[in-house]
Structures are given as structure tokens and as C-alpha cells.
Amino acid sequence: AILTGVPYYILPSTSRAGFSPDNLRKNTSQPSCPLDLITQLRFPRRIGVPVIFTPQNSSLKVVPLSHNLNIHTCSDLWFCPESKIWTVKSSSIHRGLVVTTGGTFRSLGSWFRIERHGDSYKLVHCPRGSTPCRDVGIETVGGGGRRYLAPRDRPLAVRFTRASG
């Protein structure tokens, strides 16, 4: 069970390379604000930055499947003035919608859900807080093969690992 308010890493079910907002990556020369993409780290065993899941029903202690929730990057280090809450925004550079930070707590546009996907899970984005929702998958861009999260027809199978400490 995933507990409300507890930090977890989101990891692809087939890899140990996790995710991090661009503004926290050490190889970034300057912050990527305001469009701070959630990108996959290039090195296996780099598990990324943990997140906290907050269900729409704040009285729940366990995050339920297929219910609205906010995803909040859990890091004391932050270089952008925008919030740490995940949302989906349009990007002309990346030609479409991307998962980014700068969302608003408990508001339309910042709702995601965790759903079963075979033996794993998947994230879906529900912009209106209800259907239709769209699977969150991986998009690859550039010659370096930078991988970032975006609404896609093919979901990314993920698992969750509780952050220690």
C-alpha cells in the first residue's frame, strides 16, 4: 500500500533509473523554469527524487487506486519559483503536452491517478478530475535521447519504492 504523505520513488518497472525535475539535475547549467520537465535519469541505479502523493480525499491514510491525487516533488533543494506540484502543460519546444512542475494543489489540471497495469502500475493524468484521463508515458527527444514524462497512448509501467530516512 502507498501511504499518504510518505515519500516514494517512481521507478519504471523494467529499470532502476528514476525521475527528477530538470531543475534538480546536477548537469543542468541553469534552471529550466518555468517549464520544468520530469525527466528520466540516464544512469541505472539513480533512483531520482522522491514524490509525495496526496489524495483528493485528504482524510485517507492510504492512497487508493483510480482516485484523484496530487503528486508533489519532495526536495528541499528547489531552483524554480513555481510550485513542486506536478501538472501537464503545453510545450512548443517539445511539440505537445508534457508533465512538468508548477501545478496548483487540489485544482483542475493537477490531478493524476495511480492505476493497475498488468503486474505493475501506471500514472494517468485527469485534467478535469474525471474521465477522460490520459496515460502518462515516456517521450524521447533530441540526439541524446532525453526521456521525459508526457501524456501518451502507451503508458509507462511503474512501481513505487518507499524513500528511506
Swiss-Prot record:
| A Pfam family matched in the record | Kunitz_legume
List the InterPro entries.
Kunitz_inhibitor_STI-like_sf, Prot_inh_Kunz-lg
The superkingdom of the source organism is Eukaryota
State the UniProt keywords alphabetically. Answer: Disulfide bond, Glycoprotein, Hemagglutinin, Lectin, Protease inhibitor, Serine protease inhibitor, Toxin
SUPFAM superfamilies in alphabetical order: STI-like
Cross-referenced SMART domains: STI
User: Which molecular function term from Gene Ontology is one that the record holds?
Assistant: toxin activity
Disulfide bonds, paired cysteine numbers:
C33-C80, C126-C133
The positions flagged as glycosylation sites are: N27, N57
The record's note on activity versus temperature states: Hemagglutinating activity is stable between 30 and 60 degrees Celsius.
- Describe the task this protein carries out: Glucose and N-acetylglucosamine binding lectin. Has hemagglutinating activity against human and rabbit erythrocytes which does not require divalent cations. Inhibits factor Xa and, to a lesser extent, trypsin. Does not inhibit neutrophil elastase, human plasma kallikrein, papain, human plasmin, porcine pancreatic kallikrein and bovin chymotrypsin. Has insecticidal activity against the termite species N.corniger. Induces apoptosis in prostrate cancer cell lines DU145 and PC3.
According to the record's subunit comment, the protein's assembly and interactions are: Dimer.
Q: Family per UniProt?
A: Belongs to the protease inhibitor I3 (leguminous Kunitz-type inhibitor) family.
Tell me the protein's name. Answer: Bark lectin isoform 1
Instruction: Identify the species of origin.
Output: Crateva tapia (Garlic-pear tree)
